[in-house]
């Protein structure tokens, strides 16, 4: 059985190696295509359980101000502009200034890095907003932006005022706990409309 599986998968390896050279989005989309080529239908978790997606509007008790709304719009525009480079799904802004961009480290580590910079006095801007959304053309079946209680805790440690995510395109893990942590930390969590095209 093991030998037969190895012989079967061996011809697929050049494709897998090509996918690895293109970043996360290309890798995940390529894997989905390989399964589809074998007759499988690939669906996202949100296709099976749409209730895991954040709707438009506030998740907890707090809402962004008008100035914070402007930063949210700028963050979404930034993510759309950097999407073709497969940089990441998140950016942190404060008063129209980019403070951090998610890369290979992921959202939690980006927030930890931001907290360290703030503790070291490298960031003087008060507050800030984590904006998270899928990048244009991203295969959302395989890589949907996600937040949860740990994200909110990381945002609080980084001194942020809140989190804005693409409504209907972001998974919220443990929504009740996420809401409770956001309210406890006095952070807003809000689903906002995003115009990034879906693949």
Residue spans for each PLM region:
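Conserved small/polar residues in nucleotide/adenosyl-binding loops
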Residues: 1-3
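Ser/Thr/Gly-rich flexible loops in soluble cytosolic domains mediating phosphotransfer, phosphorylation
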Residues: 8-42, 47
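Short, ordered loop/turn segments at secondary-structure junctions
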Residues: 21, 47-48, 104, 133-135, ...
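Electropositive phosphate-/nucleotide-binding environments in soluble metabolic enzymes
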Residues: 21-25, 29, 65-73, 85, ...
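Internal active-site segments that recognize and position negatively charged phosphoryl groups
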Residues: 31-47, 51-108, 112
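Short coil/turn connectors at secondary-structure junctions
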Residues: 37-40, 86-89, 94-97, 123-128, ...
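Glycine- and Gly-Pro-enriched alpha-helical subdomains that act as flexible
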Residues: 91, 95-152
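C-terminal binding/interaction regions
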Residues: 153-197
């Amino acid at each position: 059985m093991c030998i037969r599986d190895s012989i079967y998968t061996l011809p697929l390896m050049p494709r897998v190696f090509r996918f690895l050279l293109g970043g996360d989005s290309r890798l995940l989309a390529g894997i989905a295509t390989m399964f589809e080529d074998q007759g499988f239908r690939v669906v996202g978790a949100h296709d099976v359980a749409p209730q895991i997606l954040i709707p438009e509007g506030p998740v907890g008790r707090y809402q962004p101000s008008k100035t914070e709304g402007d930063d949210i719009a700028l963050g979404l525009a930034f993510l759309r502009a950097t999407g073709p480079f497969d940089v990441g799904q998140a950016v942190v802004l404060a008063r129209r200034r980019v403070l951090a961009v998610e890369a290979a480290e992921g959202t939690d580590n980006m927030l930890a890095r931001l907290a360290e910079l703030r503790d070291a006095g490298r960031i003087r801007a008060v507050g800030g907003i984590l904006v998270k959304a899928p990048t244009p053309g991203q295969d959302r079946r395989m890589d949907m932006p996600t937040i949860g209680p740990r994200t909110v805790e990381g945002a609080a440690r980084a001194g942020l005022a809140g989190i804005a995510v693409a409504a209907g395109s972001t998974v919220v893990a443990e929504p009740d706990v996420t809401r409770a942590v956001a309210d406890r930390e006095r952070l807003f969590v809000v689903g906002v409309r995003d115009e990034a095209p879906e693949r």
